[in-house]
């Protein structure tokens, strides 16, 4: 009975015993030391009830919540891998609550400036995070200065005051304005007009650099040339070179920016001009040399203009080519030299001379002609070519070459009759250029040797070929000259 009462007391007093402990601020050891001591008693066997388990879980949760509580003033913990990934891919991001951004502050935004009318598009605005480097941005020149080339990104000393005070100056209508504070989400929708001159009636920039104005304005100026040490001795080089041969008062790059050029290679011939470093459509101006006494940019020999940006080194220019005479290759008669006269030209020359009508002549039917004595024509052709062995068989084979070329044709059904295919005007203009007739040779240039001639000695031994000595021949008689 006593054990049953004791067991009943434990069943009823366990929740109250645990509830008398601190509700979560105590340690786990103090919360469990009481029931553990009673459960270890050999005389007490408490029944397992689900309420005890729920009480243990509730104390575990209260302990965890108490340890996990962090004051609101402390910063939250960010794992290391998160910061490492952001360091390589994006700017460092703090999870700590930031103060109110100055971009949303109406006192620091562009809303304090009065709205200006822009007829050519939106303003050229950038984020306020880039305000410190804005001092080196390319600004438009002073109202009284001349048009300056974009090749000079850094201004001179007299324009620096204007750059510092340009943040508070009001721009002229119709041109862009670089705002000091602007929204980071507002993107420029039009071309930044701050590179153009602010005066509406002043002349624009030089034409070869107009293509730079069609690009959007970057947040930082593009420095394409190496900046050298500024020497005050060359301060006058930035003045307009009007008295030194300047064109229309355009200003060439000042002494603040020095374009480095390669040294002249004296191994090449000075007559052949190499690739010019500047493609100018007018006369060129090169930089001053250290040994020159004159200040500024000196005028040198005019550069050769090249229309494209391709480096072309021609072998010779038009002015360097020597003009040869028209008759350089025609000092004498045009066909005097060996090999210069062609066969069809030789035939036209024979037909054009009336004294040759006994061995070659026109037939009167268009451009047809007949070789009355073909062997004589072949002999004369052999004299022109210095070939004594020339005959009509060789001449006729040469004429077949002109059949394929469309110059001559053989008249069918007639012997030694040919015709020219082309018109007479074209024929004589091609055969006699500049109306010069060929000078035909009447004899060979050198003595004829026996090797160049056909041997005819065997014909002298036969009496049949000498009718004046052998009398009338009887070819079919028994004593005739022909024996078979």
Swiss-Prot record:
Transmembrane is among the record's keywords: no
Known outcome of mutating residue 443 to A: Loss of polysumoylation and ubiquitination
Subcellular location: Nucleus
Cross-link named Glycyl lysine isopeptide (Lys-Gly) (interchain with G-Cter in SUMO), sites: 96, 226, 260
InterPro entries: Ets_dom, ETS_fam, ETS_PEA3_N, WH-like_DNA-bd_sf, WH_DNA-bd_sf
Top-level taxonomic group: Eukaryota
Pfam families given in the database record: Ets, ETS_PEA3_N
Post-translational modification: Sumoylated; enhanced upon ERK/MAP kinase pathway activation, it positively regulates the transcriptional activator capacity. Sumoylation at Lys-96 probably requires phosphorylation at Ser-101. Transiently polysumoylated and desumoylated by SENP1. Sumoylation is a prerequisite to polyubiquitination which in turn increases proteasomal-mediated degradation. Probably polyubiquitinated by RNF4 and deubiquitinated by USP2.
A cellular-component GO term for this protein: nucleolus
Family, similarity comment: Belongs to the ETS family.
Protein name: ETS translocation variant 4
Organism: Homo sapiens (Human)
């Amino acid at each position: 009975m006593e054990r049953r009462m004791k067991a009943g007391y434990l069943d009823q007093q366990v929740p109250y015993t645990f509830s008398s402990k601190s509700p979560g601020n105590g340690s786990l050891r103090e919360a469990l030391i009481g029931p553990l001591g009673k459960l270890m008693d050999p005389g007490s066997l408490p029944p397992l009830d689900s309420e005890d388990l729920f009480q243990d879980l509730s104390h575990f949760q209260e302990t965890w919540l108490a340890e996990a509580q962090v004051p609101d003033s402390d910063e939250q913990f960010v794992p290391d891998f998160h910061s490492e990934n952001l360091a390589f891919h994006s700017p460092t991001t703090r999870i700590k609550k930031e103060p109110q951004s100055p971009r949303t502050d109406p006192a620091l935004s562009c809303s304090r400036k009065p709205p200006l009318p822009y007829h050519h598009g939106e303003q050229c605005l950038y984020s306020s995070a880039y305000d410190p480097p804005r001092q080196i941005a390319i600004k438009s020149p002073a109202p009284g200065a001349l048009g300056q080339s974009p090749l000079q990104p850094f201004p001179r000393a007299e324009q620096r005051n204007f750059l510092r005070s340009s943040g508070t100056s009001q721009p002229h209508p119709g041109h862009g304005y670089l705002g000091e504070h602007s929204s980071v989400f507002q993107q420029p929708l039009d071309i930044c007009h701050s590179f153009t001159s602010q005066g509406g009636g002043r002349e624009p920039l030089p034409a070869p650099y107009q293509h730079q104005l069609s690009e959007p304005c970057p947040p930082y100026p593009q420095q394409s040339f190496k900046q050298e040490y500024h020497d005050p001795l060359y301060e006058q080089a930035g003045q307009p070179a009007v008295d030194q041969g300047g064109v229309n008062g355009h200003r060439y790059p000042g002494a603040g920016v020095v374009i480095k050029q390669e040294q002249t290679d004296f191994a090449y011939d000075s007559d052949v001009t190499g690739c010019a470093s500047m493609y100018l459509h007018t006369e060129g101006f090169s930089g001053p040399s250290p040994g020159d006494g004159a200040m500024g940019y000196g005028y040198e020999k005019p550069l050769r203009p090249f229309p494209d940006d391709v480096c072309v080194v021609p072998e010779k220019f038009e002015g360097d080519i020597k003009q040869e005479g028209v008759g350089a290759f025609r000092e004498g008669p045009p066909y005097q030299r060996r090999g210069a006269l062609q066969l069809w030209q030789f035939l036209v020359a024979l037909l054009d001379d009336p004294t040759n009508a006994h061995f070659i002549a026109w037939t009167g039917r268009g451009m047809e002609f007949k070789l009355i004595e073909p062997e004589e024509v072949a002999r004369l052709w052999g004299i022109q070519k210095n070939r004594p062995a020339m005959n009509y068989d060789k001449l006729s084979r040469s004429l077949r070459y002109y059949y394929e070329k469309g110059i001559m044709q053989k008249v069918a059904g007639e012997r030694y009759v040919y015709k020219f295919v082309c018109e007479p005007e074209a024929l004589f203009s091609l055969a006699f250029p500049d109306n010069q007739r060929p000078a035909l040779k009447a004899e060979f240039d050198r003595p004829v040797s026996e090797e160049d001639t056909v041997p005819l000695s065997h014909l002298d031994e036969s009496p049949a070929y000498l009718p004046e000595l052998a009398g009338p021949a009887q070819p079919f008689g028994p004593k005739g000259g022909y024996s078979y």
